[in-house]
């Protein structure tokens, strides 16, 4: 059963490699891709059920026992993230079938799509820091290709910033890996948790912790290192933007939550207070960017920034309720954000623009599109009874219980500004007078909406099934707040 752990990585990697051989056969690529991504989702669900029933699953590659060999570790948090990545992978791929041009398909869109999923799943499942770096690079190299597909001037200019900032982050990552190896002699996360706990060099460990925080903050889009994100995510087609918006920043957030609950928990008075400050600044400046925009995709891009602030807010508060709220919020945000980017793509196909001032009246001509967007928008803003409300409520309640009143006030204010900016999209794009042509009004949007329906349905389910989902989030929080569970499973102590 342990071999199941590698399948969410192996399936997309093998499929991506295989699809390179059929670069000119687009129809065949679509068929293979469709079956493969659904298969990956089914395997991910099976793995998650197994871990939930039987506990943490560890795969020692080559039968080299940890901490000496490479290990893959599937716990509740990792398997949840793998399932979410697979869901977004399925939906975005089927949306791409409708929207990606043959020009982009012939330049290896499908192979690199799967390589990116392999990197994402690998980052969630790896049990050591060096292979976390390796999977980050697999993911990022694939994203470099996907972000420039089409080769427009805007894409190339903005993707250069994306590449430069991530190359710098990768260099800093290696520096951090070398630094922590030099004082502990290991890179296995479970072994690091043990050895860091035995060290009395708090100052040195804090420096290393800050290095890793900067690295993951660059990749996760935290203040003040988010400047690359809004314009980089504006250029690619909607399917790619949705994949990036739903997943890529969450890999950075996952890495922060994993390392700062397992390894760098030696001085929470310093590290987690710093994280809490960054969370507040990220939320505030991200939502200000969203409020100031009048472009559909740019508003959504800035909201990625503001919303990751909520996720690390839970880590900064560092209580069971706060971590559970953050876990719930991550699941909510991945689903909702992917849906919203796909809605942006659908409206762009109808109107030919993402400029809100050039839109209007879509509610009359495309009511299903309008109301499905509305559900996702108010969920993002945190309106009950949808998923955004319950996750934000848990985070804000945790802040009040922990007497973190300032961050609670920031979270409430950001929620109101999020609602304002999302209603601005709804009013400009869907309300008012029709500004598109008769041909655009008659555009058949059904095929585009079909892949988005599961995401909207999940958004509703995550809200109406809040009780069992929050109980699961509490279980995840209990597991990651008790490092001994992870350590004993990996090191078999």
Swiss-Prot record:
Main location: membrane
Short name of one Pfam family: Proton_antipo_M
GO MF term list: antiporter activity; NADH dehydrogenase (ubiquinone) activity
Keywords for the protein's UniProt record, in alphabetical order: Antiport, Cell membrane, Hydrogen ion transport, Ion transport, Membrane, Sodium, Sodium transport, Transmembrane, Transmembrane helix, Transport
Membrane-topology descriptor: Multi-pass membrane protein
InterPro entries: CPA3_Na-H_Antiporter_D (IPR050586), NADH_UbQ_OxRdtase (IPR003918), ND/Mrp_TM (IPR001750)
Gene Ontology annotations of biological process type: ATP synthesis coupled electron transport; sodium ion transport
Entry's transmembrane regions: 4-23, 30-52, 72-94, 107-126, 130-149, 162-184, 204-226, 233-255, 270-292, 299-321, 325-347, 368-390, 405-427, 448-470
GO annotation, cellular component aspect: plasma membrane
Subcellular location: Cell membrane
Subunit structure: Forms a heterooligomeric complex that consists of seven subunits: MrpA, MrpB, MrpC, MrpD, MrpE, MrpF and MrpG.
NCBIfam families named in the record: PRK07691.1, PRK12663.1
Note: Mrp-dependent antiport apparently occurs by a secondary, proton motive force-dependent mechanism, but the similarity of several Mrp proteins to membrane-embedded subunits of energy-coupled NADH dehydrogenase complexes raises the possibility that there is a capacity for electron transport that could provide a primary energy coupling option for Mrp functions.
Family that this chain belongs to: Belongs to the CPA3 antiporters (TC 2.A.63) subunit D family.
PANTHER family: NA(+)_H(+) ANTIPORTER SUBUNIT D1, NADH DEHYDROGENASE
Primary role: Mnh complex is a Na(+)Li(+)/H(+) antiporter involved in Na(+) and/or Li(+) excretion and Na(+) resistance. Na(+)/H(+) antiport consumes a transmembrane electrical potential, and is thus inferred to be electrogenic. Does not transport K(+), Ca(2+) or Mg(2+). Mrp complex is a Na(+)/H(+) antiporter involved in Na(+) excretion and Na(+) resistance.
Annotated protein name in UniProt: Na(+)/H(+) antiporter subunit D
Organism of this sequence: Alkalihalophilus pseudofirmus (strain ATCC BAA-2126 / JCM 17055 / OF4)
């Amino acid at each position: 059963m342990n071999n199941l752990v590698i399948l969410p990585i192996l399936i997309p990697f093998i499929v991506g490699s295989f699809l390179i051989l059929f670069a000119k056969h687009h129809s065949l690529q679509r068929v293979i891709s469709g079956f493969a991504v659904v298969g990956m989702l089914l395997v991910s669900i099976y793995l998650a059920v197994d871990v939930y029933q039987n506990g943490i699953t560890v795969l020692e590659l080559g039968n080299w026992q940890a901490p000496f060999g490479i290990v893959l570790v599937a716990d509740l948090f990792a398997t949840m993230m793998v399932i979410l990545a697979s869901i977004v992978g399925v939906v975005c791929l089927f949306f791409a079938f409708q929207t990606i041009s043959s020009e982009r398909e012939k330049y290896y869109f499908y192979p690199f799509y799967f390589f990116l999923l392999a990197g994402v799943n690998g980052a969630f499942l790896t049990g050591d820091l060096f292979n976390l770096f390796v999977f980050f690079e697999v993911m990022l190299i694939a994203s470099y290709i996907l972000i420039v597909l089409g080769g427009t001037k805007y894409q190339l200019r903005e993707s250069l910033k994306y590449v430069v900032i991530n190359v710098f982050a990768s260099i800093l990552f290696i520096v951090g890996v070398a630094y922590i190896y030099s004082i502990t002699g290991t890179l296995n996360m479970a072994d690091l948790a043990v050895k860091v706990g035995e060290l009395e060099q708090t100052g040195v460990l804090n420096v290393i912790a800050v290095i890793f925080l900067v690295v993951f903050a660059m990749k996760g889009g935290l203040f003040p290192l988010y400047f690359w994100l809004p314009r980089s995510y504006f250029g690619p087609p909607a399917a790619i933007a949705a994949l990036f918006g739903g997943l890529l920043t969450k890999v950075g957030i996952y890495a922060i939550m994993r390392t700062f609950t397992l390894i760098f928990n030696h001085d929470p008075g310093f590290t987690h207070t710093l994280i809490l400050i960054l969370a507040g600044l990220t939320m505030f400046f991200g939502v200000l960017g969203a409020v100031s925009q009048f472009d559909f995709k740019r508003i959504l891009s800035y909201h990625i920034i503001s919303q990751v602030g909520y996720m690390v807010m839970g880590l900064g508060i560092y209580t069971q309720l706060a971590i559970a709220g953050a876990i719930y919020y991550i699941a909510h945000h991945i689903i909702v954000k992917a849906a919203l980017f796909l809605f942006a793509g659908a409206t762009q196909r109808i109107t030919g623009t993402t400029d809100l001032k050039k839109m209007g009246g879509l509610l009359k001509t495309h009511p299903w599109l309008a109301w499905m967007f509305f559900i996702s928008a108010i969920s993002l803003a945190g309106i009950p009874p949808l998923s955004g409300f319950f996750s934000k409520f848990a985070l804000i309640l945790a802040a009040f219980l922990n007497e973190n009143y300032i961050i609670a006030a920031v979270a409430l204010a950001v929620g109101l500004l999020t609602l304002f900016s999302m209603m601005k999209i709804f009013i400009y794009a869907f309300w008012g007078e029709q500004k598109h042509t008769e041909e655009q009004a008659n555009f058949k949007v059904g095929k585009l909406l079909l892949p988005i329906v599961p995401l909207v349905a999940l958004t509703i389910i995550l809200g109406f099934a809040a009780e069992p989902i929050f109980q699961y989030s509490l279980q995840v929080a209990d597991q990651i707040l008790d490092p001994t569970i992870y350590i004993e499973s990996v090191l078999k102590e």
